[in-house]
């Protein structure tokens, strides 16, 4: 007689479900990450196939480093979009739409992403040596929150530019995402980006806004790596490389805080404290190495996905094996240029509509970071730190950043880089830093199925 499974208590061994159900659950997790993961390369000009490969390999690497204990999927990080838009901004096509990849500068951006992953490794080592509370003292929400807010605001103009190519498709995509997020139930609430793309794409088909020529020309099988796009071959010490480092590496300081929140969310969902076992040092190391690998191969930064945490909460299947099945499926899809060609037929207007709400939510997540941690803005110290960060980020970004020469090498700091440096220094210098790290902060919000950085 087969063992009866009590789903209400959660399933920690998916093998009890049988191979068929495990595969279906893996497909479900793949769809949960899919919309957000493929959106990043569409917004930056990176390869969709390379991105899927890096997401799959990064997830498997993360599971290996965390002793196969943490049921987390690593997909493309939205937080780094601001860095990509500064280092390798999309170029205009013949119609004035920002759809052309900046092939000259993308490898430098990817190389900087690879180095930003090393920041995670340093943080992992410091946490192992000094403990998490001492390290997080330097990166309180009054610093990381405004940085995240700035990222979304810097990206906002590009969303409007993309929407202008087809406002009908943009409004359909935007409206669908809003409806799914506010009124959706179950998987509908967890997959707002994917559903938004599908619904608006259907409208695009009806209105004749989709060009299928590239699909017929694409091969069914191909290698998802492109040497000319790899960050590995852009580590050359050039001014472009150095400037990219200063622009993108500071973003890692903010995404590390999101990582902590995501791991806390998974812990709350599953009922196991992953911050203690296998340890935050291991989860940071796994995320960091996955990001470094992705950058070297020409992909975007990886991050733990809140969408998949929502699937865990909905299905109550907590076995990390199911996540690894989704990772393998992502790798398989990455070897099909035909599939990438289909993704690349998504009209610019749809991308604009999705990014319209996405970029706003990046800033909103920064606000949430500040609110959940009860940052006191009646305290003039906190007001000064936040004010300096916001003005540095937006102000210097509007004038092209700050440039200076050191040892004959010209270095250009973006507004985000200046903001991060100024915020960290002010927080360290000004008296009254009473922040105490709480690993459980934000765990509820991260399981809600909303979009994640």
For every predicted segment, state its role.
Residues 85-91, 181, 308-323, 329-334:
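Interfacial segments of multi-pass membrane proteins
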Residues 20-35, 169-173, 191-192, 223-262, ...:
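Hydrophobic, membrane-embedded alpha-helices of multi-pass small-molecule transporters
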Residues 46-51, 68-81, 135-144, 189-194, ...:
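Short, non-helical or kinked segments that cap or interrupt transmembrane helices
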Residues 11-20, 42-63, 67-69, 249-320, ...:
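Membrane-embedded helical hairpins/re-entrant loop segments and their flanking transmembrane helices
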Residues 5-7, 34-37, 173-180, 191, ...:
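Juxtamembrane interface elements at the cytosolic ends of transmembrane helices
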Residues 105-213, 327-440:
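Membrane-embedded alpha-helical modules
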Residues 1-24, 212-232, 268-275, 283, ...:
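Intrinsically disordered, low-complexity non-transmembrane regions of multi-pass membrane transporters
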Residues 1-74, 78-103:
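N-terminal signal-anchor module of multipass membrane proteins
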